[in-house]
Every structure is written in C-alpha cells, then in structure tokens.
Amino acid sequence: MTDTPRLLNSANWAARLTMAIDAAQNTVHVLTFTVIATPQGVDFEQPDPYRAIENAAKRGVNVRLIRSATQHETLPATSGHAAAARLIYAGAQVRCLPPRPTLHAKAHCVDNKRLFIGSANLSRSSVTSNIELGALLDNAVDIADFEALFRSLWAAAQPEPMPHPGGR
C-alpha cells in the first residue's frame, strides 16, 4: 500500500472496488445516494460492486450501508428499496438518512484499509454506461476521518424499512 491517492475512472473503478470488496475480511462501510440491484439471475461481464457487497454480507463480513432517504421516497419500490432489502436479507445492515440535507456522497471503506471515493452510485448504469471518476486512498488519517464521519451518520440514520415478504 502507498499513501498516494490513485485516480480511478470508468475503465477501472468498478473492477478495483469489486476486487477489494471480494477480499474483505472484516468490514465494508458504504455511503451512497442510490442503490439499485442488478436483477437476480442477470449477469453482465463488467464487475458488479453491488453483488460483491451482497456476497460479502453472505460470507459474514460486517457490511453497513447508508443511503439517502430521498431515494426511498422518490423511486419505485422495485429499485432502491428492493435493492436495500436484498442486502439486509444477505446479512447487511442498511440505514437511511433523512432527506434534508440529501446524502449525495459515494464512498466505500473496506477493512479500514482502502477508501474509495467517487461519483459512482451502486447501479448497473454506473458500471456499464456512465462516465465516472474517483480516487482510491489508503492513508490511515483519511480512513480514520471517513470512519468518524460514517459513525456519526450511522447514528443519525434510521433503519431501512423492510418490505413484507411477498411484496405486500
């Protein structure tokens, strides 16, 4: 590891993030505005950070995700809320921040060793068709600052409301 930030772009951000999450052993902390699951049974050739997060939770990694309540209020139940529910069923903890101010940050911290900060949401379009930009940091001070912010946002956030099984 190095203390020099590395620039990530549309060609490499999803692969780097997915590899880091696939290797996670202890924690994955995520801030995101939008989380939209890749439909179950649909695979595409690009790396899939959402599936990596879901799989990390299934293998016992402590996954915590904070998303904007604004998304929950404005998008149909088939997108953000259903994606969050899938993560919860996999073993992740998901919380929503109140709509004001809107959480628009996108960051992923893996095992308190790697911090990904960028423009990409957890969505297929961010992987397949958007122009995204970000940075990978492994500086202990930056990671500690992020984790302090994450803890304060986690304390302010509310648990994701769970849908009734069967969608009722």
Placement of each model-derived feature along the sequence:
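Signature of lipid phosphatidyltransferase scaffolds
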Residues: 1, 10, 103-168
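Short acidic active-site motifs
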Residues: 16
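A glycine-rich helix N-cap at a beta->alpha junction
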Residues: 89-98
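A short, aliphatic-rich alpha-helical micro-motif
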Residues: 21-25, 110
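Short, flexible loop segments at the rims of nucleotide/cofactor-binding pockets, characterized by
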Residues: 4-10, 40-42, 93-94
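Primarily the HKD phosphodiesterase
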Residues: 24-89
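Conserved beta-strand termini and adjacent loop/short-helix elements that scaffold enzyme active sites
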Residues: 8-10, 66-68, 97-99
